[in-house]
């Protein structure tokens, strides 16, 4: 459930432009921040403030404006009722499968709003601070779910949800975008900067290495010699390596803009025009910085609450629906939770803006693999819980093949609907694999 911003690669274009920490968003800051066109901007709704402007008291007008922009300023506002319904269902002991479903639906608009609020803060703090916020908090929902699952010692949920988000971005999001983008631009040549794909593929291969070695170590040890401690130590060391790589990735974009892939081009007026996104909204922030920080805290707390419900009821939902936990964690959680982000990537592909699409899909996958996963391992360490990077053979094989297929598809810097179809078919095969897999390992035994 990654945040709905154009993460890592495209968010980091904020870093390339420098930026200050002015209290008020200037026109130059707004221009530079807008260079990272986010998927959330595509599902924004035009706010009609005519009625609010008639309110006599200034303080009340500000409150109503904030409520309208934050709660009603998205096309996903129709899903907000799922948040209180999930709380009520949990409070009054409704079927736990319903609690899971309502929590999953409620997380979709909350994740999008976290992205929106981070974007608003970036307008006020400047592109450097805003870019760092997006680079570290771009997948806040996934991290919250993972940490809560660690607290409940449901390590399989942690690994499935994180791996599912990576596979979803590499195959489903990117595949859908390339397929539909290719069909809608049959008479146009779709191209992108291949350096962006090369950079992210290289980092994903590093993450794959760090996940594969603990699994290999586990298989090479004799059963009577294995106690798990060596694998855990290796996993923690590998986590530090991945974090160093991610930090180097940020620095590379910050200080080596002449070597790194250029930021996605700002779409022309005819490309970014949308009936629900006004020119005024594109000029700068629509709420104040402290209001954005306040709402960001509220949304994060709600995400934590629903994530707790989600983790505690996933096994009950799997039993009720006749599905394996593996299928729910790998397939359902990422698709439903990242629906807004997926839609944004597809829309950019429709508009022949594949660099932005790659920034969303590859950037999110890289951020989860190199930042969220190692942070989760280290947080578990601080909690006195042993978590390793052994994702098991089937999951690791799916990860490796997904990276390989994606890197092959993107190596020449061109796109067509056939490439997207291949990625989608790969995702279908993986989904079918986890759908039919109902082995004891697919149950939560701890």
UniProtKB/Swiss-Prot annotation:
| Annotated GO CC locations | plant-type vacuole membrane
Q: What induces it?
A: Slightly induced by Mn(2+), Na(+) and Ni(2+).
Q: In which tissues is it expressed?
A: Expressed at low levels in all tissues.
Q: How does it sit in the membrane?
A: Multi-pass membrane protein
- Ranges facing Cytoplasmic side: 1-69, 118-128, 184-196, 260-285, 341-359, 410-416
Q: Does the keyword Membrane apply?
A: yes
State one Pfam family annotation.
Answer: Na_Ca_ex
Q: Name the segments for region: Disordered.
A: 1-33
Low complexity composition bias: which ranges?
Answer: 1-16
Q: List its uses.
A: CAX4 expression in tomato increases calcium content and prolonges shelf life and may serve as an alternative to the application of CaCl(2) used to extend shelf life in numerous agricultural commodities.
User: Is Aminoacyl-tRNA synthetase one of the keywords?
Assistant: no
State which ranges are Extracellular (membrane side): 91-96, 150-162, 218-238, 307-319, 381-388, 438-446
Looking at the UniProt entry, the stretches that span the membrane are 70-90, 97-117, 129-149, 163-183, 197-217, 239-259, 286-306, 320-340, 360-380, 389-409, 417-437
UniProt lists the family membership as follows:
Belongs to the Ca(2+):cation antiporter (CaCA) (TC 2.A.19) family. Cation/proton exchanger (CAX) subfamily.
Q: What is this protein called?
A: Vacuolar cation/proton exchanger 4
Q: What organism does the UniProt record list as the source? A: Arabidopsis thaliana
